[in-house]
Amino acid sequence: MEAIKGSDVNVPDAVFAWLLDGRGGVKPLEDNDVIDSQHPCWLHLNYTHPDSARWLASTPLLPNNVRDALAGESSRPRVSRMGEGTLITLRCINGSTDERPDQLVAMRLYMDERFIVSTRQRKVLALDDVVSDLQEGTGPVDCGGWLVDVCDALTDHASEFIEELHDKIIDLEDNLLDQQIPPRGFLALLRKQLIVMRRYMAPQRDVYARLASERLPWMSDDHRRRMQDIADRLGRGLDEIDACIARTGIMADEIAQVMQESLARRTYTMSLMAMVFLPSTFFTGLFGVNLGGIPGGGWRFGFSLFCILLVVLIGGVTLWLHRSKWL
């Protein structure tokens, strides 16, 4: 496979263009650099930038059927062999504070043993771990190691997010035991996050498993073993997601039951109050008709005696309800 000149890969508005030094570090790509399997290049682009979009559409380094995928046409995780290279689409957790975490970020990449082209629109936070290792000189030394480290970082972020959702579910379950109902929409958002994670992480696990089984020339046996470990780890995360989805369904039923019981208690309380005051309401209405005058209206103790009779009547009804075990 022929070497590539640095001038063929340098894009003015690239997020970064680096040359791996083969010792775990990187250096900025220059026009006179030679890109080969010993010193591969990593070109990271935002496909919405004008120069990046033009380079993706015109460079002879990419197969024609790869251009649209790198320009944002591909969304679901998948892996495809394209001659000597491989096209991979991955999803990662969006941890930005101004965006909802259930909106996963897509990262698309095409790579062979000489160079890596990765594209995105929103920032891929998981890449910061790989970038930090490369800048410190402890990163991958070749394309196979780079792919394994990226997949490992994506899985770490996914696992952390799954743990956060699991902790929220535990807190909800504890609150429900104390008859505390979560705010409206909270459980629905939590369930949506779990479903979105399940939708994209399941095919991503299959991508990792296929990469572990494919005999790609730029991946060693150690790389394939590590990739299989990553696939197994993400599979355990998917099992946790399935369990969490089932628990949210149980919690939804429990919340509905708690609210129904609360409504029943309030209705029962109002019914008892109506039973207690119904006799007194009847007598006050009867005495207030005024068709033949108010009985006892001319006696100065008439009103006091009537109030005492009402208190006795209410007390008697309350005592009867208590003995009947309605109170």
Curated annotation (Swiss-Prot):
Q: Where in the cell is it found?
A: Cell inner membrane
Keyword terms of this UniProt record: Cell inner membrane, Cell membrane, Ion transport, Membrane, Transmembrane, Transmembrane helix, Transport, Zinc
Q: Name one GO molecular function term.
A: magnesium ion transmembrane transporter activity
Name under which the protein is recorded: Zinc transport protein ZntB
Where is it mostly found? membrane
For the Cytoplasmic compartment, the record's topological domain ranges are 1-273, 322-327
Can you tell me which family this protein belongs to?
A: Belongs to the CorA metal ion transporter (MIT) (TC 1.A.35) family.
